[in-house]
């Protein structure tokens, strides 16, 4: 027993250093800190982090455009997986820097953290840039980077590798009409690995979003890489109506409550802000979202500009309700107004202040009130000029508010005596552990499967919720249908975390939510409906990694009193072949018609025991792409569903033909 912890002791001794002196202090110079800890600068080394590099370079070109010095930005994706981003702006300065007389300003910008023109209000009134660290981070994390600057009939160019200078600044003659900056780079596989590359669809959508945010810029797009059908080889991207064009491309007109988008574009010299917005309301909340930006940089956590917009909408609607004598508007809250709203908001200000390194939330003071006043003035006019629209909106919001207030009056759910308080038709069998850590909720269909699962579970950590009634397709249902559906009510009450904008992850009662359906086609259909529900109603739950799919077996094979399980036809064939070769004994094959047919011990051993089961984790990597697929496959329009199935069938057929040995 005395040796039981010897390994840990030895390990601990190695870690402790009693001679802590100056030599233990590691000093990283130049761009070394970026290469050593890339996550501190771009948030990681995954695919999303890699695309931050594109954002940084593109934001620099956008700063030139917003400042009025550039009108055209070019993005070209090359076959070698490098990317070139160019603009026709002023071009990065190439004269020697006052603090570094032996270096050009270009070299200083590329090799020094926190350098660049955007820190001076004399150069840019408004500026973006992802982390304020400049193109130097891109240079540090690029396997190769080449920069070209066109100025006054000259071409200046320089090459770098992994942040280190390869060549001196070279000057050549060039046509006088050419001006601006061009950067070509490829991410370093030492940092990001050699299996991920820039995603054309992701970069194309980024380019489109930037063009929407500043209507004065045209982006020339070219892609040499094979991409999905919705990514063109070449395109000119320009949106003269800005965010209104963007919102129009995101919504389905048939679902709108209002026939008109509430939009505006105002520049206030007095307040020092430029504000643009576009808002519409739909019949259900499945497509609701808020996207906000400051100086073309996304602010997913909102901030003071969003606060101003929300106050303007709430004040405007309450004022209109009071004007028309509708007393029920007094109960309105901002969550009622935003429940089914699709909102895009963009603000340009000088010297913005953000929370955190990644600029995800705007915290600049003096922004909220001007934004509120500007938007409210326009909203008041919008409502008073469109009485029919205004009254429809008011009725819609009041209905949502009444539903919210009714739910608020329900008793708080506790684990103790949960079945009585929840009053679930399926009789939730809850676990005894009071904290969410290590707990699991198995969602099954019907009482038969629920009975087997309840007997097979670990009562301390595993809960079982059998859903009764038809699982609703929330992608094609109205908000009224969704909130009145029994299965959805049961599920939302059991999870207790709320949905859509009312989702609170700290209230989620289980660590893992596991969809456990039959292993056949019917089970897959139910699982797809439930996944659609979670994606549209609780996307944050999916993003945070709480949603899983169980993998129950479809077949049971018995040979010589030994039992084996197979998940599908292919696995059954392989297992049969293997057993036939190892023994001549007869193989008996049985097919489970459903989970309810399985004995509790079988269900436990194959599907529910944490150490013996297989789970599929449901993840969200490309939200916009998933959103489109869900809309095509699960939405209201059958022609979209037919087109999706047809395209997938063609892909499958091509694969089969390619695999045929003819």
From Swiss-Prot:
Mg(2+) 2 binds at residues 518, 520. InterPro entries: DNA_gyrase_B_C (IPR002288), HATPase_C_sf (IPR036890), Ribosomal_Su5_D2-typ_SF (IPR020568), Ribsml_uS5_D2-typ_fold_subgr (IPR014721), Topo_IIA (IPR001241), Topo_IIA-like_dom_sf (IPR013760), Topo_IIA_B (IPR000565), Topo_IIA_B_C (IPR013759). One of its GO terms (biological process) is DNA topological change. The record marks 470, 473, 525, 641 as: Interaction with DNA. GO terms for cellular component: chromosome. Pfam families: DNA_gyraseB, DNA_gyraseB_C, HATPase_c, Toprim. Keywords: ATP-binding, DNA-binding, Isomerase, Magnesium, Metal-binding, Nucleotide-binding, Topoisomerase. Its cofactor is Mg(2+); Mn(2+); Ca(2+). GO terms for molecular function: ATP binding; DNA binding; DNA topoisomerase type II (double strand cut, ATP-hydrolyzing) activity; metal ion binding. Binds two Mg(2+) per subunit. The magnesium ions form salt bridges with both the protein and the DNA. Can also accept other divalent metal cations, such as Mn(2+) or Ca(2+). Mg(2+) 1 binds at residues 445, 518. Topoisomerase IV is essential for chromosome segregation. It relaxes supercoiled DNA. Performs the decatenation events required during the replication of a circular DNA molecule. HAMAP family: ParE_type1. This is DNA topoisomerase 4 subunit B. It comes from Rickettsia bellii (strain RML369-C).
């Amino acid at each position: 027993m005395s040796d039981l912890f010897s390994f840990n002791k030895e390990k601990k001794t190695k870690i402790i250093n009693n001679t802590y002196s100056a030599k233990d202090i590691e000093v990283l110079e130049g761009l070394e800190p970026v290469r050593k800890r890339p996550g501190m600068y771009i948030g990681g080394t995954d695919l999303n982090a890699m695309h931050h590099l594109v954002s940084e370079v593109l934001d620099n070109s956008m700063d030139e455009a917003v400042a009025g010095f550039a009108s055209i930005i070019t993005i070209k994706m090359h076959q070698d997986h490098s990317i070139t981003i160019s603009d026709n702006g002023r071009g990065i300065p190439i004269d020697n820097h006052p603090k570094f007389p032996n270096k050009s300003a270009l070299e200083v910008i590329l090799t020094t953290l926190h350098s660049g023109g955007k820190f001076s209000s004399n150069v840019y009134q408004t500026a973006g840039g992802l982390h304020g660290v400049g193109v130097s981070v891109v240079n540090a994390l690029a396997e190769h980077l080449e920069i070209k600057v066109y100025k006054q009939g000259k071409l200046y160019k320089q090459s770098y590798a992994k942040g280190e200078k390869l060549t001196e600044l070279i000057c050549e003659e060039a046509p006088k009409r050419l001006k601006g900056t061009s950067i070509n780079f490829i991410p370093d596989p030492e940092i990001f690995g050699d299996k991920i590359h820039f995603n054309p669809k992701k970069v194309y959508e980024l380019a489109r979003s930037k063009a929407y945010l500043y209507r004065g810029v045209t982006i020339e797009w070219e892609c040499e890489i094979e991409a999905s059908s919705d990514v063109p080889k070449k395109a000119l991207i320009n949106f003269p109506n800005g965010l209104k064009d963007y919102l129009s491309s995101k919504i389905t007109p048939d679902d709108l409550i209002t026939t008109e988008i509430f939009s505006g574009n105002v520049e206030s010299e007095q307040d020092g802000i430029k504000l643009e917005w576009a808002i519409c309301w739909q019949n259900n909340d499945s497509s609701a979202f808020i996207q906000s930006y400051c100086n073309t940089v996304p602010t997913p956590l909102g901030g003071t500009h969003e606060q101003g917009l929300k106050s303007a909408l709430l004040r405007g609607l309450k004022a209109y309700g009071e004007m028309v004598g509708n007393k029920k508007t007094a109960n309105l809250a901002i969550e009622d107004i935003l429940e089914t709203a699709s909102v895009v908001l963009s603000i340009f200000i000088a010297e913005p202040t953000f929370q955190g390194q990644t600029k995800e939330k705007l915290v600049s003071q003096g922004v909220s009130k001007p934004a509120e006043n500007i938007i409210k003035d326009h909203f008041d006019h919008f409502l008073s000029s469109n009485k029919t629209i205004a009254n429809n909106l008011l009725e819609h919001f009041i209905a949502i508010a009444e539903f919210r207030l009714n739910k608020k009056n329900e008793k708080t759910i506790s684990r103790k005596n949960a079945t009585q308080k929840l009053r679930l038709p399926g009789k939730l069998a809850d676990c005894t552990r009071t904290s969410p850590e290590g707990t699991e909720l198995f969602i099954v269909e019907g009482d038969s499967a629920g009975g087997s699962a309840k007997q097979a579970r670990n009562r301390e950590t595993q809960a079982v919720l059998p859903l009764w009634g038809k699982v609703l397709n929330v992608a094609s249902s109205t908000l009224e249908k969704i909130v009145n559906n029994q299965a959805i009510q049961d599920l939302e009450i059991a999870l207790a975390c709320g949905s859509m904008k009312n989702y609170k992850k700290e209230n989620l009662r289980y660590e893992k939510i596991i969809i456990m359906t039959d292993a056949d086609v019917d089970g897959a259909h139910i699982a797809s409906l439930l996944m659609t529900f979670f994606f549209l109603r609780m996307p944050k739950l999916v993003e945070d990694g709480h949603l899983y799919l169980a993998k129950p077996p479809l077949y049971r094979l018995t040979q010589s009193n030994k039992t084996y399980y197979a998940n599908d036809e292919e696995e059954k064939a392989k297992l049969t072949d293997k057993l036939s070769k190892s023994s001549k004994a007869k193989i008996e094959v049985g097919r489970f018609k459903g989970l309810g047919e399985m004995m509790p011990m079988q269900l436990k051993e194959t599907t529910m025991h944490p150490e013996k089961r297989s789970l599929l984790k449901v993840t969200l990597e490309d939200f916009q792409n998933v959103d489109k697929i869900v809309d095509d496959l699960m939405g209201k329009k059958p022609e979209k569903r037919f087109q999706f199935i047809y395209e997938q069938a063609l892909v499958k057929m091509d694969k089969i033909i390619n695999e045929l040995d003819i």
